[in-house]
């Protein structure tokens, strides 16, 4: 049976930090935009449908789609440039892929030098056809990263008005706090789902809650593994979530999104879909909370054992 969403369904707004950047609580991830086989007009229609649901924040990275995803989004945005001031654009940099589009790259590696951060931003702005990014993230921690150099690059980009807010992705608590002491960070985007619960237990989320900073959560549905396949433990987790969803009369994925957003540091989950119905399911997850019993039932099934 098809789930019917109320016409008034809207994603709420959420501040990443006190007096900081405000995003939609659900963020539309653009990683796979090149796989959606949409024309520029169809991409624009999808963007507009997301925004009608209150999903005004769009997550990119320079490398997505083998360096093509930002350009596909920018091409669509150029058809309706007035939308730019009604949305928030997030992008990432710091990874250099082996790619025919980057013939100068001899090996896949990280680069968090000031020069690369700056050139990546310039390229993202051109591709997205905008004059500023609302949020720039360092994509992954780099063994050669110099916190002072990164902070200096951030400061110069902010002064130039090319990037309004800054953060990181996949950083440990210590790495985050080391850079945050040098330049105020808005968020840490990390993997989090019932099949990847480490941020709850490795102090990543504790540290962010202590600072009053909300993380962003990528792969909230575990890359689709929650829906099919997996071992007996995953199958049991799937059944537990399904039972809760049936009892609450909510879509399966809405329960997962609600579970993620119930963590006290207030994560903002990313979608990865080109189907507006699936975005609506994510937004519905903002409309209810789980009982503690149901929340812990999912955690128990995810970990395969009771809490101590």
Show the residue positions of the predicted features.
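Active-site mouth loops of central-metabolism enzymes
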Residues: 30-41, 103-115
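Structural motif corresponding to the early beta-alpha repeats
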Residues: 84-111
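Short, well-ordered coil/turn segments that N-cap beta-strands
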Residues: 21-26, 54-57, 83-87, 130-134, ...
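CE4/NodB-like, metal-dependent polysaccharide N-deacetylase domain
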Residues: 116-137, 157-160
